[in-house]
């Protein structure tokens, strides 16, 4: 029996145990994991160092190495996230709605775990902790399949989680890692319908598109972040500068960083040159259309591919438009339905933008960097969904649940 199938069978078995665990039991397990991560920090960092060294040998970009890197502070941040997760209300067992029918039947809609969650992701070893702990909090078994670039880190983290769970009432197999990082193991996970209730891809556009195209199991799509900010002609100059610099340069390798700015031509004529200089001073490489290049001849001429690309680095595309309608058309054509923003003092244009732009999160006069479970007040998140079914936007605890109906009667039969 191959690894993926064996772990699928075990996960299904464990899921039936997890549904019986109380909130206190689950929280005790989470606390044990947080403690064990601190106790074994040196071991985790030693294994992470192996991934970093191998990544450098393979010529990984600085942005990819940053996503791969763990240090003491990042592990502390993981444990703080787990502590916050413990404090969140457990959604399992809550009554979503209840009513009584004229025939006396009492109907309740109850929140329940999804069952077995598959998680396939790239680079970031912190996702291993996030996915494992969020699934445990919601009573789900989880099968993790990270990338080869983070295999040493992921194996170390999961072994630490197993040692923590063995101190609690939760089965250690509640969290399992597929150690085979070949394409074959991924394909097997895509079709594990008998054992997997949902598969969540988290990574770049190529990974997500592959999962959506090839998986026969249900998929919760966490889309790539080809995010835009439109600077309307009435936008406040300093506000626009602050928001764009934050949304691009604070952490360019994340999915809610912007990849394109769309400038109204009247605003660009006044402030474009200064904005471009400010961005270049911060190491940003600009690629613009003809109108942008006319403002600053040092800007590279953008290609069609640039409008479509999630750079995840200090590269930014620039589009200059004549109207809000033209901006909306560009964003809807090239955006990934993740996070889009408008900076303007014109409420009519805000209304047009919010009504017409198709994305999970829309902003007025704020950075797209806020599309995040903790920033939304959800606490933990397992990803940001860009699809429309089941859940959209940051996926907090309720996103990893389903519902079932519980009907109580006193002998009713249907006539």
Swiss-Prot record:
Belongs to the gamma-glutamyl phosphate reductase family. InterPro entries: Ald_DH/histidinol_DH, Ald_DH_C, Ald_DH_N, Aldehyde_DH_dom, G-glutamylP_reductase_CS, Glu-5-SA_DH, GPR_dom. SUPFAM superfamilies: ALDH-like. Its EC number is 1.2.1.41. The lineage of its organism: Bacteria, Bacillati, Bacillota, Bacilli, Bacillales. Pfam families: Aldedh (PF00171). One of its GO terms (biological process) is L-proline biosynthetic process. The gene is proA. Pathway: Amino-acid biosynthesis; L-proline biosynthesis; L-glutamate 5-semialdehyde from L-glutamate: step 2/2. Its main location: cytoplasm. One of its GO terms (cellular component) is cytoplasm. It comes from Bacillus cereus (strain G9842). It is found in: Cytoplasm. This is Gamma-glutamyl phosphate reductase. Keywords: Amino-acid biosynthesis, Cytoplasm, NADP, Oxidoreductase, Proline biosynthesis.
